[in-house]
Amino acid sequence: MPQLNTTTWLTIITPTLLALFLITQLKLLNSHLHPPTPPKFTKTKPHAKPWELKWTKIYSPHSLPPQY
């Protein structure tokens, strides 16, 4: 049964881990240097709601006597 040749594993795994470490560090550094801009508050016009424009009758359940 042939043996698995692992001599090149160290030369592959080490640069890969180094690259992943550098990428994560750059991402963290970039997020701390440039915080997200705060949202700009604009004045909004209040919208007319349909239930505020017209009067609606409120019905009571049939089991209750009418309330005047």
From Swiss-Prot:
GO terms for biological process: proton motive force-driven ATP synthesis. One of its GO terms (cellular component) is mitochondrial membrane. The chain crosses the membrane at residues 8-24. The modification N6-acetyllysine is found at K54, K57. InterPro entries: ATP8_mammal (IPR039017), ATP8_metazoa (IPR001421). It is a single-pass membrane protein. The modification N6-succinyllysine is found at K54. Keywords: Acetylation, ATP synthesis, CF(0), Hydrogen ion transport, Ion transport, Membrane, Mitochondrion, Transmembrane, Transmembrane helix, Transport. It is found in: Mitochondrion membrane. It comes from the Eukaryota. GO terms for molecular function: proton transmembrane transporter activity. Mitochondrial membrane ATP synthase (F(1)F(0) ATP synthase or Complex V) produces ATP from ADP in the presence of a proton gradient across the membrane which is generated by electron transport complexes of the respiratory chain. F-type ATPases consist of two structural domains, F(1) - containing the extramembraneous catalytic core and F(0) - containing the membrane proton channel, linked together by a central stalk and a peripheral stalk. During catalysis, ATP synthesis in the catalytic domain of F(1) is coupled via a rotary mechanism of the central stalk subunits to proton translocation. Belongs to the ATPase protein 8 family. F-type ATPases have 2 components, CF(1) - the catalytic core - and CF(0) - the membrane proton channel. Component of an ATP synthase complex composed of ATP5PB, ATP5MC1, ATP5F1E, ATP5PD, ATP5ME, ATP5PF, ATP5MF, MT-ATP6, MT-ATP8, ATP5F1A, ATP5F1B, ATP5F1D, ATP5F1C, ATP5PO, ATP5MG, ATP5MK and ATP5MJ. Interacts with PRICKLE3. This is ATP synthase protein 8. It comes from Pongo pygmaeus (Bornean orangutan).
